[in-house]
């Protein structure tokens, strides 16, 4: 899976889980501040990323994933 494919899939998951429009999502978007996620939304997003990409994201790493770019970079580096 290429980085571009990972980005597209992450965007799809964000749209599905957070109920935002795709055009609202930017690479620098913060899940809480820009996309309106609360802590439960963020946990559900991390769980969906783990499931979709077959990666384990430990809690200490999940706490550092606050933007779309950070989520994509994390997955790219784990693949």
Swiss-Prot record:
Pfam families: PP-binding
A GO biological process held by the record: lipid A biosynthetic process
Highest rank taxon of the organism: Bacteria
InterPro entries reported in the protein's UniProt record: ACP (IPR003231), ACP-like_sf (IPR036736), PP-bd_ACP (IPR009081), Ppantetheine_attach_site (IPR006162)
Gene3D superfamilies: ACP-like
Pathway(s) per entry: Lipid metabolism; fatty acid biosynthesis
Role: Carrier of the growing fatty acid chain in fatty acid biosynthesis.
Protein name: Acyl carrier protein
């Amino acid at each position: 899976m290429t980085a571009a494919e990972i980005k597209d899939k992450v965007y799809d998951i964000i749209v599905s889980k957070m109920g935002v429009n795709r055009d609202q999502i930017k690479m620098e978007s913060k899940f809480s501040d820009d996309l309106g996620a609360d802590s439960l939304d963020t946990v559900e997003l991390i769980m969906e990323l783990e499931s979709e990409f077959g990666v384990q994201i430990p809690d200490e790493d999940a706490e550092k994933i606050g933007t779309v770019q950070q989520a994509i970079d994390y997955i790219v580096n784990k693949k």
